[in-house]
Amino acid sequence: MTTINCDMGEAFGLYRMGDDETLMPLISVANVACGFHASDFNHMRKTVRLAKQHHVKVGAHPSLPDLQGFGRREMKMSRDELANCIIYQVGALKGFLEAEDVALNHIKPHGSLYGMAARSDAVAHAICDAADVFKTPLMGMIGTQHEIVYRARGHAFIAEYYADLDYDDDGSLIITREHKAVDPAEVASRCLRAIAEGKTRSIHSRDVPVRADSICVHSDTPNAVEVARAVRDALTSRRQ
């Protein structure tokens, strides 16, 4: 059954990002920010509690150490540095999960770290080095180093499809610094096609292969609530 995942807990101190309270009942999996691109100790625990309240599974959403750039700027780090960076973040979230008696469901890298791992086997291996510590599945995209390296290293692989981002002609994701509003009905239609046909349209209207074990909706998309509701309703109708 295809799930809906959403990046959550991305507020920081007095700064707000996303409508987590409204989004949480609409999703099945929350990727919780771990402090390096967004969030802090108070928001992490608050988000874990909110997910528990709505019976939403929780995964870690670690980032490059780029709080000012929201984790959407690339950095050069050694494999050991990167693995330690991820272990540090996931370990922090795991402490809050244990405090609330909630299991760690998966790890999904954030932003530029996600994009780098899709292209670079060295970065993907660093992520696996961290995942080895926590013995948890990894979320990523088919046809990339995510799938190749994660599977080769023996990690369960959750293939995701992005509801609110564009794909390039080679099937890679176009990661932008800021997200724009999208048409909920069009997004829902794209998601259903991704599930049924394993295809989506690129920015130049070419079909590229995808797989949608889980569908991602970003909480910082301006109309994220409407998008999540449209995707949820489409999936519910498909199952009936």
Feature-to-residue mapping (PLM):
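Acidic (Asp/Glu)-rich catalytic clusters
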Residues: 21-25, 46-59, 98-99
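A short alpha/beta connector and helix-capping loop motif
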Residues: 12-45
